[in-house]
Structure formats: structure tokens, C-alpha cells
From Swiss-Prot, chain B:
GO terms for molecular function: acyl binding; acyl carrier activity. It comes from Gluconobacter oxydans (strain 621H). Carrier of the growing fatty acid chain in fatty acid biosynthesis. This is Acyl carrier protein. InterPro entries: ACP, ACP-like_sf, PP-bd_ACP, Ppantetheine_attach_site. It is found in: Cytoplasm. Keywords: Cytoplasm, Fatty acid biosynthesis, Fatty acid metabolism, Lipid biosynthesis, Lipid metabolism, Phosphopantetheine, Phosphoprotein.
Length: 428, 79
């Protein structure tokens, strides 16, 4: 990005929070991910036996110390029923991120310089389902006064701001499965433009309910062939893949203007190195041949990276949903990287946690930061027989040790919306 | 205490997440028990459901304390 509007303001990540099918907690999720564990199992949130897709990545219940979800550790009991599950999961990740960052605004100026941008792809689907049953059974007057604020997507941002007194920009992104990347990218720009010094940004999703699974089944988007072998169901690029696996959870980062982070001695996970967007203008659910939209999003991310080239990028966390579109993304990545594709590692972590829809891009951006920090590329599980060959190392089955200074994460959503974000090692 | 009073108290404890000892007859839902305006709407709905009574909006607005709720419901049930 050029011009005076940004005043050269750099944006770094100083806090991370994850709620995933592998664990509640960014570090435990990461540990289990690089061990090759899978978070996919038979659906227990409801009885899925009437539906063709019966497996998903559900957040495990259990003690917080063991990586399970104990909701009362995050949301007071009396407030829980005022929020859909996607808000519960979003708050759990956001609270982790804020506490990890150590940022506590001390005065009104600080509070006004701290904003929130946490979105969701779908929002309170189970709440809407339950509410419509109440109305259709003739009890419209009994509909809870919390029905609307429970279902609204921007209410994670709302609740978080109330909890911590964050009075800066309060916003929420809704771009289906690209939500998480758009939230982090757009929030970074708010910091670059001086609208805030700190932004808490990310995405959350909890659509593993009968309406959500039935809807994606009808769109023929979900895997139906591995109901008896759930951990094998999500298999990006494999020739036997047959659809995506729904996951639930949330990913949230604390973004901070570099000098602000330095002044308070904050721990820095990495820097936002670039961000690009595009639209397909093609079809509501399918990308076009060659996935030109993905190509243009990656190109746009590089264009405003301050001089990075494809040779600098060591790792791509692919959108890679375990659908036919995987190979179209592969086409676009190969074309974009050209000769540099040979030295690239690319994996799809959806093989382990499923597709977290509006949370996916945020969780995957956090994985990129952890990969940079630890020098480890997470694996693509179940890639037994690639549907087609590629010069790109897709990190089948087991994690790899590799020096990673720069990583790129792709997310694409229904409607033909594409976003790419570059995360890089922080250097003075 | 009447059955109605017991049941009202139980609903208040459940919906507002407050300690039973705080739910005294004179306790105000908003001033003493931490409710906001949406909480009071939901409380009234819960009373309607539990006691099979209709509480019109103008009556609901006058129910500010635990005792107000008990009195209103007892009157409706006696009628």
C-alpha cells in the first residue's frame, strides 16, 4: 500500500486464541495438529441419521485445562442463554487472544483506540431454527427478547467490547468461508489508517446443527462416503475426496500497531505482510476453471506486501476443503508461483479440523504464525493418492520441519469471494 | 410462603443467575438482582408460561419487584 494515508504504520500480531475440534486453546490445538491428530468424528450435537452427511469436527466438551470446552469458564451462566453457540465459541477465542496479548486499556484514549472485528459466515443458525419453531407453533409472543441479539453476527464484537471496554471501531465481517481472512485483513487496514491502534479480529462458526448440515447436504457440498470412518473423511487433493467436513470453532488475533506493541514490550508472533481480495463474478458456489479469483487475490496480497516476491513465500495454508475445487486452487497456486512452486510447501489443515467456514481463515492464519515461530509445517492428513501430481510439496500425513519466514493463507467463500493474507516473521 | 411465591422465586433464581438468599419479596429485578430491560421481558414470559396466565404489557411494566410478581399472579389465579 502506498501513499500517506497509512503513514508507514506496520501491524503485528500480539495475541492469539483458538477454539477448534482439536482443542480449546491455540497451543494445544497446534500441538495436536502437528502430531497428526484428527478432530473429526460422528455428529453428536443432534441425531444425524436422517442425513447423508453424519460426521463433523465438533469442539470437545471437557475441563479447560485438558483443552475441552467448559463454557462457564468463558461466559457467565446467566448470559449463556442470551447468545448462540457461535458467540460462545467466538468469545472463548477472543478472551484467550486478549489475555495472551496482555493488553488492558488504562484510560479513555486507550479504550477508544481499541476496536473489534470478529465475524461469522452464518451466525446463529440454531437460534433461528429454534425461534422459528416457537413462532410456527403459535407462540410468537413467547419468542425470547434475546432471540435477535443471540443470532446477530456482529454480537461477538458487541459482547467483547462490553466485557473489556473497547470503544474503538466495532465491526463484523460476513463473507461466508472467507470471513476470517477478511476480518484480519480489514482490521489491519483500520490500524494502518489510524482508526485504531489495536484491533481484536477473527471469525467464529457453530453451524453443526440439523439445518446447517441439511443445507450444505442439499448443496452437495459435504462428504457422505466416510460416515463409518470419520477421521478419513477430510482428504484434500486426494482422489477419493467427496466433499468437505463441517467444523466449528473460532480463531481470533490481537492486531497491534508496531510502535504501540513495542512501547509496552508486547510479545510479537509475526507481522501482517500483505492482504489481497478478489471476486469471481462467476457462480454462487463454484470457482471458475483455473481459479482466476484465487490467483488475483494472491497477486493483490503480494502487491501490497512492501516488496515481497513469490520466492520469499515458504508456506501456503491452502483453502483446500476436500472438494473438487482443491485442484482449481492448486492450478492457481502453481501458476502464481511459477518456478518458485518447486520449493514451496502447501498443506490443508482442514484435513484435521474440517472446514470452520467463517472461522477457517482466522484459525489458519494463526497456524501460519505458529508454523513461522516453530519452523514446522502442519500436515495434510489422508492425502494417500493425490488426484493429480504437483511440484508443490503438499506435506502428506506428517508434519515437516522447515524454516518458514513468510506464509500465505487462502480463503474462498460462496458468492465468489476470495481473500489471501501474508504473515511474516517479525524483523526490525 | 405460598406455592406461587416459591415458584416465582425459583424462576427468578434460574433466569437471573442470582443467589436464592437475594430473592427477597422487596428485591427489585433491575436495582437489586442485576436484570436489564430485556431480562425483565423474559422473566415475565417465564411467569406466563409457568402459571398459564396472560400478563399484558401495561401490567408487566408495573412488575418491578418479586412481591409485585407474586401479587399479580396470585390475583390472576384467584379470579
Amino acid at each position: 500500500m502506498s501513499g500517506t494515508a497509512t503513514n508507514g504504520r506496520r501491524v503485528v500480531v500480539t495475541g492469539i486464541g483458538v477454539v477448534s475440534p482439536l482443542a480449546v486453546g491455540a497451543e494445544l490445538t497446534w500441538k495436536r495438529l502437528i502430531e497428526g491428530q484428527s478432530g473429526i468424528g460422528r455428529i453428536t450435537h443432534f441425531d444425524p441419521s436422517e442425513l447423508p452427511a453424519q460426521v463433523a469436527g465438533q469442539v470437545p466438551d471437557g475441563p479447560t485445562a485438558e483443552g475441552g470446552l467448559t463454557l462457564s469458564d468463558w461466559v457467565p451462566v446467566k448470559d449463556q442463554k442470551k447468545m448462540d453457540r457461535f458467540i460462545h465459541l467466538g468469545l472463548a477465542a477472543a478472551i484467550q487472544a486478549v489475555e495472551d496479548s496482555g493488553w488492558t486499556p488504562e484510560d479513555e484514549d486507550d479504550r477508544c483506540a481499541t476496536g473489534v472485528m470478529i465475524g461469522s459466515g452464518i451466525g446463529g443458525l440454531q437460534t433461528i431454527y429454534d425461534g422459528s419453531l416457537t413462532v410456527s407453533s403459535g407462540k410468537a409472543r413467547r419468542l425470547s427478547p434475546f432471540f435477535i441479539p443471540s443470532a446477530l453476527i456482529n454480537l461477538i464484537s458487541g459482547h467483547l467490547s462490553i466485557r473489556y471496554g473497547f470503544k474503538g471501531p466495532n465491526h463484523a465481517v460476513v463473507t461466508a468461508c472467507a470471513t476470517g481472512v477478511h476480518a484480519i485483513g480489514d482490521a489491519s487496514r483500520l490500524i494502518q489508517y489510524g482508526d485504531a491502534d489495536v484491533m481484536v479480529a477473527g471469525g467464529a462458526e457453530a453451524a453443526i446443527c440439523s439445518l446447517g448440515i441439511a443445507g450444505f447436504c442439499s448443496a452437495r457440498a459435504l462428504s457422505t462416503g466416510s460416515n463409518d470412518d470419520p477421521t478419513k473423511a477430510s482428504r484434500p487433493w486426494d482422489k477419493d475426496r467427496d466433499g468437505f467436513i463441517m467444523g466449528e470453532g473460532a480463531g481470533v488475533v490481537v492486531l497491534e500497531e508496531l510502535e504501540h506493541a513495542r512501547r509496552r514490550g508486547a510479545k510479537i508472533y509475526g507481522e501482517i505482510g500483505g492482504y489481497g481480495m478478489s471476486g469471481d463474478a462467476y457462480h454462487i458456489t463454484a470457482p471458475a476453471e483455473g481459479h482466476n479469483g484465487a490467483f488475483r487475490a494472491m497477486k493483490a496480497a503480494l502487491r501490497n506486501s512492501g516488496g515481497l516476491t513469490t520466492a520469499d513465500i515458504d508456506y501456503v495454508n491452502a483453502h483446500g476443503t476436500s472438494t473438487m475445487a482443491d485442484d482449481l486452487e492448486l492450478d492457481a497456486v502453481e501458476r502464481f508461483f511459477g518456478d518458485d512452486a518447486k520449493r514451496l510447501a502447501m498443506s490443508s489443515t482442514k484435513s484435521a479440523i474440517g472446514h470452520l467456514l467463517g472461522a477457517a481463515g482466522a484459525v489458519e492464519a494463526i497456524f501460519c504464525l505458529q508454523a513461522i515461530r516453530d519452523g514446522i509445517v502442519p500436515p495434510t492428513l489422508n492425502l494417500d493418492n493425490p488426484a493429480r501430481d504437483s511440484v508443490i510439496d503438499r506435506v502428506a500425513h506428517v508434519a515437516q520441519q522447515r524454516k518458514i519466514d513468510v506464509a500465505l493463507s487462502n480463503s474462498f467463500g460462496f458468492g465468489g469471494t476470495n481473500a489471501s493474507i501474508i504473515l511474516k516473521r517479525f524483523k526490525d | 410462603m405460598s406455592d406461587i411465591a416459591d415458584k416465582v422465586k425459583k424462576i427468578v433464581v434460574e433466569h437471573l443467575g442470582v443467589d436464592e438468599s437475594k430473592v427477597t419479596p422487596d428485591a427489585s429485578f433491575i436495582d437489586d438482582l442485576g436484570a436489564d430491560s430485556l431480562d425483565t421481558v423474559e422473566l415475565v414470559m417465564a411467569f406466563e408460561e409457568a402459571f398459564s396466565v396472560e400478563i399484558p404489557e401495561d401490567a408487566a411494566e408495573k412488575i418491578a419487584t418479586v412481591k409485585d410478581a407474586i401479587d399479580y399472579i396470585e390475583k390472576q389465579k384467584a379470579a
